[in-house]
């Protein structure tokens, strides 16, 4: 394994909602399920035994803890496999005052060497991205040596191992109304689609247009409830109201974009763009795509005038490598 370590400062921007939004628009984040907890290996720092009643009053005080990790995304190797574009997202339990010192204690090792760097996106969150996609079918180990942070000697060191699966890269051409899915470099399937039709302007942004850029798959549901609440329409009597149960939904942004089975309107698939921003697919194509999807798979969308923002979901590949590294607290 080759150790790769880097880091970064932060920006977080608001993203326009898309009409295809589900009831719960925020990005899916890893929860501390039993399986996830099992995937995180906790390495305790040295512990000083408690003094006995006869101990001297000058015995060493309990070691201090001033920083812990609250969450790591994605899950570990025992819970899921991840795609070749996957980021490592680390959230701390409080604001990090000395980012450079903390970043220097975050290590990433991969079986297939690749350059990577951290980028701070908030006072508590830092994200690791590689310069090029991870190689498929390998293990990646993340370790946080927080007990080495001055004044934090009582903290526990934490590690998590990730398993990279197949290299899934999908290319959506909104002008030709097709999605080509490549697995390990070979074309596996061509799926007729219908993308966003445009026509609804919010704050100068046409939110009915699908965003063009490099997306990452963030999560998936066999059935997702999608409603009109994103635009403030909650009254069933309103002609604009809708609430639909959509099969085979794979999330690709924080602005409510999914690749999913079309709810009817099959006559438009492969012919014209008629959605509210999502990528609609045939029932068979959507189910197949859902089944092969791993979080961190790459979905490249082309052909629209609405550009994907780098901080819309996991769209970190929208920044070039020089831009990405500027977010690190460690200056080379």
Task: Describe the residue ranges of each PLM region.
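Acidic, low-complexity Ser/Thr/Gly/Pro-rich repeat segments typical of extracellular/periplasmic
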Residues: 2-11, 21-167
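Extracytoplasmic/secreted envelope proteins and their assembly/folding machinery
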Residues: 89, 103-105, 143, 190, ...
